[in-house]
Design a protein with these regions (language model features):
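P-loop NTPase motor core
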Residues: 28, 107-189
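Conserved catalytic network of the ASCE P-loop NTPase/AAA+ motor domain
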Residues: 20-23, 48-53, 81-85, 122-126, ...
Length: 239
């Protein structure tokens, strides 16, 4: 296990309890309820991996527009126009593509997953990116109305493995008691890693916590730790 190349999360307190980071090429899901900061935490993984490492990545968004995402992350101190990261992080808004296809009357006839995989393959070959964030799986299936989401998730994860991407897929917690990672019941066992963000209420206070539920080829600490953002250090910290 010691010889595996790893990508540090740059979440203070996490890497030291996870053998230095996430194994390269892993497919991880980042799950949590609405408001648990899934997008912010996952964007910080990408941003700091690019800022401190020799890598590049793509953030695929469907949840919020490109400008809104840039502005939100910039307010947190993660400026995508910073010269150190500017040419190494691409933000792709898939809802733009949906609008174009709707206008052409094509959105119902298209193999969405095939198109997405084709686009990722093309970017991988042209700009050589290594990290992928997908925000979010649920929004993608709502947008595309695919008939067999479980099969399509398998197809997407396999494509990411083939392209040797280290990938983070954002998912909502679902099920009657909100204990299911993702909406289709297969995301957690098809993935290599599961990071779970929770919100715990005590009186009027809410504490966000992070737990690493699963990380293949990695000795990691189980249990949940409070997670806080430090604007000064531009990183999350767990305590």
């Amino acid at each position: 296990v010691g010889d595996i190349e790893r990508i540090p999360t740059h979440i203070a307190g996490l890497d030291e309890n996870m053998q230095g980071g996430i194994p390269q090429g892993h497919i991880c899901i980042v799950a949590g309820q609405s408001g648990a900061m899934k997008s912010s935490v996952t964007f910080s993984l990408l941003y700091n991996a690019v800022l401190y490492g020799e890598t590049s990545g793509i953030y695929v968004t469907l949840e919020q527009g490109k400008d809104s995402l840039r502005s939100h992350m910039s307010n947190m101190g993660m400026n995508v126009d910073d010269p150190r990261v500017r040419n190494r992080i691409a933000i792709i808004d898939l809802s733009d593509l949906r609008v174009q296809l709707d206008e052409q009357g094509m959105s119902n006839r298209i193999d969405w997953m095939g198109q997405l995989i084709k686009q990722l393959t093309s970017y991988r070959q042209s700009i050589g990116f290594e990290l992928l964030v997908f925000d979010s799986l649920g929004a993608f299936f709502t947008l595309t109305k695919m008939e067999n989401p479980r099969d399509e998730i398998f197809r997407l994860f396999e494509a990411c493995r083939r392209l040797e991407l280290t990938s983070f897929f954002i998912c909502e917690m679902t099920g009657e008691d909100h204990k299911q990672f993702g909406e289709y019941g297969v995301e957690d066992y098809l993935s290599d890693g599961v990071m779970h963000l929770t919100m715990e209420r005590t009186g009027d206070d809410i504490t966000r916590k992070l737990g690493v539920i699963k990380m293949r080829h990695t000795h990691h600490r189980l249990g949940y730790s409070p997670i806080l953002w430090s604007a000064e250090d531009q990183r999350f910290t767990i305590s």
